[in-house]
Regions:
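Nucleotide/phosphate-binding catalytic cleft detector across ATP-hydrolyzing
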Residues: 1-154, 162-280, 286-334
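Acidic, divalent-metal-coordinating active-site segment for phosphoryl/phosphodiester hydrolysis
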Residues: 159
C-alpha cells in the first residue's frame, strides 16, 4: 500500500499520531508558536510547548484547540501539515488517508472545519470518528455487540461520557471541563490562598506529582515557585497533596456530573449491562490518583481505568483506519 493511513488524536493538550502498520509514531503537545508580525509558524509541538509563557514580544505560543474543538483554524491546519510531513516526508507523491477523532458533542460546522483543515493540510481523504467510539475501540471494548458499554474519556479540554451499543453512540454527554481546567483550578487556588502567581506548566507538574482525587492518608508535599502577587517578587512555597485535592474537587465533580447525566438517560436494558461491566475510564486525566475510586463512590457503578489510558483514543483511531470496512458505520468521510 503506497499511500499511508494515519490516525490522529488532535487533543487540546497533546496530539498523538498513529500510522497503520507501525503503531504510535508521535506524541507531542498541541502547541504552536506564531510570529506576531508576519503570522508565520515558528515552532510546533515540543519545541513550542517550551515557549509557553516565556516568549519574547514578537512570538506568541498558543494552543490551537480549545475545549476539544478548533479555536484557530489556520494554526490547526499548520499543525496537521507538520504531522503529515513528519510521517510522509516533506515531499510525498501519494497523499495519505487521515482519520481524526472529534468530541461526540461537536456541531456539524465544527466537524466540517476539521475535515477541511485535514484536506488542506495534504490528506487525500479525511475521516472523522467520535472520540468515545475511538476510545472504546482502543480500550478493546466489543462496540459492535448488542450489549451496552459505557466509557468516559477525560482528556485535556473536554470529558466525554457515552454509552455504546451496536457500533454507535446511544447516549452521550460532553462537558468542556477536563485536565486543563484542573490546572486552572490549581492556579486560581494558589493565587487566592497563597497570593502566588504560577504558570500552566507548574500547575500541571503539581497535579501529576502530588495530585489525588481523594485526600491521601499520608499527605505528600512539593515546592512550588512563582511570583508573589503583592510584592511582585519571585517566591517559593511548600504545598501539600491535600491542598491540590481541595483545589481540583469542583472540577472533578463537574466531570462526574457528565457520567451521571449519561447514566440517567440510559435505557434500562443497557443500564443493567453497565452495572455488570462497570464504566471504563480513558484519557490522560483518568490517570489522576484515586479518580476511579471517587467516581465509583459518587456514581454507585464500579469504574476502572483502561490499560494505557492516554493511548486509547489514538489506538482506536488507528485500528479504525486500518479496518475501514469493519467500522464504516461509525465513521464520517469527506
Amino acid at each position: 500500500m503506497l499511500n499511508k493511513r494515519i490516525g490522529i488524536d488532535l487533543g487540546t493538550a497533546n496530539s498523538l499520531v498513529w500510522v497503520a502498520g507501525q503503531g504510535l509514531v508521535m506524541n507531542e503537545p498541541t502547541v504552536v508558536a506564531v510570529g506576531t508580525e508576519d503570522g508565520r509558524i515558528v515552532a510546533v509541538g515540543n519545541e513550542a510547548k517550551e515557549m509557553l509563557g516565556r516568549t519574547p514580544g514578537n512570538i506568541t505560543a498558543s494552543r490551537p484547540m480549545r475545549d476539544g474543538v478548533i479555536a484557530d483554524y489556520r494554526v490547526t491546519e499548520a499543525m496537521l501539515k507538520y504531522f503529515i510531513q513528519k510521517v510522509c516526508g516533506r515531499i510525498f507523491l501519494f497523499k495519505p488517508e487521515v482519520m481524526i477523532c472529534v468530541p461526540a458533542g461537536v456541531t456539524q460546522v465544527e466537524r466540517r472545519a476539521v475535515l477541511d483543515a485535514t484536506l488542506s493540510a495534504g490528506a487525500k481523504a479525511a475521516y472523522l470518528i467520535d472520540e468515545p467510539l475511538a476510545a472504546a475501540i482502543g480500550a478493546r471494548l466489543p462496540i459492535a455487540a448488542a450489549s451496552g458499554n459505557m466509557i468516559i474519556d477525560i482528556g485535556g479540554g473536554s470529558a466525554e461520557a457515552a454509552v455504546i451499543c451496536l457500533g454507535g453512540v446511544v447516549v452521550h454527554k460532553s462537558v468542556r471541563v477536563a485536565g486543563n481546567k484542573l490546572d486552572e483550578a490549581i492556579i486560581g487556588y494558589m493565587k487566592k490562598k497563597h497570593n502566588l502567581l504560577i504558570g500552566e506548566t507548574t500547575a500541571e507538574e503539581a497535579k501529576i506529582r502530588i495530585g489525588s482525587a481523594l485526600v491521601l492518608d499520608k499527605p505528600e508535599s512539593m515546592e512550588i515557585k512563582g511570583r508573589d502577587s503583592i510584592t511582585g517578587l519571585p517566591r517559593a512555597i511548600e504545598t501539600s497533596s491535600t491542598e491540590i485535592t481541595e483545589a481540583i474537587r469542583p472540577v472533578l465533580l463537574a466531570i462526574i456530573g457528565a457520567a451521571k447525566g449519561v447514566l440517567e438517560e440510559t435505557p434500562p436494558e443497557l443500564a443493567s449491562d453497565i452495572i455488570d461491566k462497570g464504566i471504563i475510564m480513558s484519557g490522560g486525566t483518568s490517570a489522576l490518583r484515586n479518580f476511579d475510586r471517587l467516581m465509583t463512590e459518587l456514581t454507585g457503578v464500579p469504574c476502572h481505568v483502561a490499560e494505557d489510558p492516554l493511548m486509547c483514543v489514538v489506538r482506536g483511531t488507528g485500528i479504525a483506519i486500518e479496518n475501514l470496512d469493519l467500522y464504516k458505520k461509525s465513521i464520517i468521510k469527506r
